[in-house]
Amino acid sequence: MSSGYLTVCVVGAGPRGLAVLERICANERQAASRTAVTVHVVDRARPGPGRVWRTDQSPHLLMNTVASQVTAHTDASVAMEGPVRAGPSLYEWAVSLAEGGSSRVAASGRESGFLAEAAALGPDSYPSRALYGCYLEEAFDRTVATAPAHVRVVTHRSLAVALDGEASEAQTLTLADGTRLTGLDAVVLAQGHVPALNSPGEERLARESRARGLVHILPANPADVDLSAVRPGEAVLLRGLGLNFFDHMALLTLGRGGRFERSGGRLVYRPSGREPRLYAGSRRGVPYHARGENEKGAHGRHLPVLLTEETIARLHRRSVDGERLHFGTDLWPLIAKEVESVYYAALLGARGEGSGVKEFTDRYLAAPPGGAEQDLLDAYAVAPAERWDWERISRPYGDRVFAGRDDFRDWLLGHLARDVSEARSGNVSGPLKAALDVLRDLRNEIRIAVDHGRVEGNSYRDDLQGWYTPLNAFLSIGPPLSRIEEMIALLESGVLDVLGPGMNVVIENGSRESGGGASFVATSDRVGGPPVRAAVLIEARLPEPDIRRTADPLLAYLLATGQARPYLIDGACGTSYETGGLAVTERPYRVVDAEGRAHPRRFAYGVPTEAVHWVTAAGIRPGVNSAILGDADALARTVLRLEPAPAPADEPAAQDSDFSQALA
């Protein structure tokens, strides 16, 4: 241990900020690096859940991960140098909460609701986001309470707005409440989703909507949206059919007092009369696939047989040698083959051909694409209708054009019923959901393969961001099957209608036939019939992470002052693709300024670095070598090895008395 003091600031107190704090405490507990360590944690929301997982949001908003596969704690699977400090998964914590209660939950004002949810929660249940927030609050409290005696944690319920300091000197962080945290030896940005400015197109539509007296709700977390202006019975357009759509669907039905009941084996919606009339659509025109019922337990996952560590290392060597990878030719064939092999293995297993499954899988993985694969499927009597078809799965309606909304609704109800049936078959036993779950299980491998510009810029933009990422979301990170059942019930009740593929929305002035006044007018490219007119349009999606349009004052300040820049990916012929991600180095993720210099005392990981890293919004899973926890440990250990920074020449060294202490 060296004598002296170290002062660190973590900006963002959600799951990533909590992980960094916990890793600092765990490493200091194992071997103290200093006489005293002070960690400032800055977030205007309560530390632990942060804003996204706050405990006062609607109980109708669910996670899309089962309770046993959610954690905030390290385990032996995490590849890291620091010590393991085990803790309960969300499910294990909920069991203890139901049995013994919690002072933190008791203080929430919603104790009875949380205790009832915890008591009913199973390992494969989907918890409310608010309950996860309670879990994170307790994890933060426990981390602070068990911190080594020489580690002091100071929380600041404010927003960071500016960061200054040369690379050779202590850093100064300014908060919105006027507090200046000086003498910082390191600053870690651990932010999640941050607010964004409107795109030019969004701003034009918002401005025109206001001028016409229409309600246009821009992309946002549904928990943050005020829906009080939406009147019972009025037509509401929702643009988007992903997870955000299902949140709005729940808030505008269950949140308005409606109920779902089982009747004759089917789910039926009992309206309250306070619901609006919902019309939803998107470019694809169908909702995300339901998640298959979990058969993998807490830690199970598909282990790659093609996209292995050895394969990724070989691809990386090519990248180091100057040969940029192309997602469509270097990675997609491996991903597709893995998915297809799992599908056929489950299909043959469901037919009772268990003894021949391994031989088939080995032969299929070795077969070149095309005729050899089809010959093998013929040999195993896999009928053409049973064969995997990426086009059919991604566009289940094919080239069909529907006569009208009734025609499309009938088709959609059949499609959704099949999706529910497939989901009930499970993510191991059910061929379709077992295959789609491979996409989720391969995220870590894909992330390792593509991160830090290893894929050529144009391919990253077009093949990965433009094509595969939305396809992956549609197929593998959808809602619980209960949400699809609810959607069916709402369609059958008439509360919800889906417009179909190729949704288009414009603003038109009213006509005598439409009752006068301006309205949003929605149509579908593939569904005939009259357009839908509404005075409310909800953009049912989150803003895309893009620091060039960030409304976060700290990130905007760093960008405006040249202390940060967007991440560039080298492309073909000397070009580069400018992403919306915050540029950082490889692990431990030092922030890079406008001149390309890495700052030795500033670090960042999380959603703002999307494009440097792929799919940064994924959560922390136990037992599968969580990238977030490994990153947090590397960040913590790097910070703890830093030499204390000298104060700027024009500013005296900070004293402990300078710091506000608002431990919550």
Predicted regions and their residues:
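Redox-cofactor-proximal catalytic regions of oxidoreductases
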Residues: 47-115, 599
